[in-house]
Structures are given as C-alpha cells and as structure tokens.
C-alpha cells in the first residue's frame, strides 16, 4: 500500500506564487487553489497512491514558537489574496473526500513525519509531497520525498530516495538535521552556529557525520582553528537549532484509543470515483 501526504501550506504557497493571477466570476482569487489541485492531480497520476491526505499549519503558535520566541519571527503575514483562498481550498478537499490534518501545537511537517512513521511500522510506502527541503530528513527505505516547485505555471518535481539523496548531498537523509543545526535556516529563523555557512557545514557533516560526533571530538578534528572556535562558542546554538529542525514523528493525530493505521487503511478502501482518488477517513 502507498500513502501520499501533501504539505498543504508549502504546496499552496508554491502554487500562489507560481501561477498567474486567476479569479472567480465574483472576483475571488483562485490561482493558488487551481495550482494546488493541478499539483495534486499530477502527483496522483504519477505516484498512484492507494490513499491520500493533506497536512496544514494552524495559525496558533506551536511548541517550537513557545519555546523560542525568535522561531519564524521574521515571517510576514500570509498575503490577503492567498488567505481568502484557504477556506475554498479546504472546502474543495473536503468535497473530494480527502482527509485534512491540522493539529494544535504542531506544524504540518510534524504531521508529515508522523504519517511517515506510521507507514514505516505498517510496512507501507509513503510519498511526502512538499515545496520545502525540511522534510528531506524523512527520506528512508519506505518514505520518499517529492520536492515540488511551480515556475510560470509549470510544475517541476524532484523525487528523493535514500540513493538519490546521498548522491546529491553525500550523507544520509537523517543528517539534514545536523546540517541545519550547523548552518541554520534563514527561512525558519533557525540560527545555527554563527559564522558557519553552508559550505563549511556540508564539509563537517560529510566528514564527521553528526553534531554529537563533532562536539564529542571537537579538539581532535582536522579543521581550521577559526572553525573550531566558532563551533566551541556556538555549541548551545547548534544544540538548540538541532532541536528546532527535528521533525516530530509521534503527533497525536487521533483521540486516545483510536488507531491511525486502521483509519488510513479503512479510508483507503473507499474509492471516490468523482475525485479519482482513494481517501482517508
């Protein structure tokens, strides 16, 4: 069985900025909805999953925001032209019978990670569809990540498997967290180690593996004294950044006593012919 889960906020943002302005007869913008559904249909055609669902962020602060007030603090509010399309998109997904997950205190990425973990322990394949690289840490033998972008209305995709990821980055997918812990992530306002950029961070992860291994033998590493000094002074920031960048994989998606595996499996057996997808309930 194959589950496909879409990173709702990420995909709709890519669609909004990648598709020319469109509107309904009453003037309501629709380009983001159109672009999202086009990506959804393409992924359904290419991946042919037995089940599909979508994760969304909520407006309320998550546990990361509450712990670190600088987390994503630089983000601008969602453009009004996009905000007015969100209810329409969710109504459309509901009409198609596609299950939506929005969990208080957690991000959409954490829902993606939890779905991937469910698939792994259930022996299913999982395809995560996203416009961000945060989810690349989830790539495994059972989980692939399809990175999507829309350019001038045309959708481009890159499918990451353990082999293709390692060929591009030179280390294991799980070490994406270590990379972000060192170099930071300006889009999420994750600081990383001050003075350590992408090139140096990539070299460190490729040579020494993980943040823990780097700091456990920092004095003996074959690195420049300046880099060692930055790492020494920035250890607390690296540890905090590692925590912020790590996707949670045990989000409580269902009330206590209910089993997500059963929900996904039973939903996958119910075919919505009008939408041409198999749904989650």
Positions of predicted regions on the chain:
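Conserved nucleotide-binding/hydrolysis micro-motifs of P-loop NTPases
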Residues: 10-11, 59-62, 133-135, 152
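Extended two-metal-dependent nuclease catalytic cores across DNA- and RNA-processing enzymes
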Residues: 23, 73-255
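Low-complexity, acidic/Ser/Thr- and charged residue-rich accessory regions of DNA metabolism proteins
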Residues: 2, 230-234, 243-281
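Metal-dependent nucleotidyl/phosphoryl-transfer cores and adjacent nucleic-acid-binding surfaces
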Residues: 6-11, 17, 45-48, 54, ...
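Non-catalytic, usually N-terminal nucleic-acid engagement modules in DNA/RNA processing proteins
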Residues: 1-53, 57, 64
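Short acidic, glycine/serine/threonine-rich loops at helix termini
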Residues: 15-18, 64-69, 138-143, 158
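A short, surface-exposed helix-loop junction/capping segment
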Residues: 66-73, 262
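Residues that cap or flank secondary-structure elements
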Residues: 31, 81, 260-262
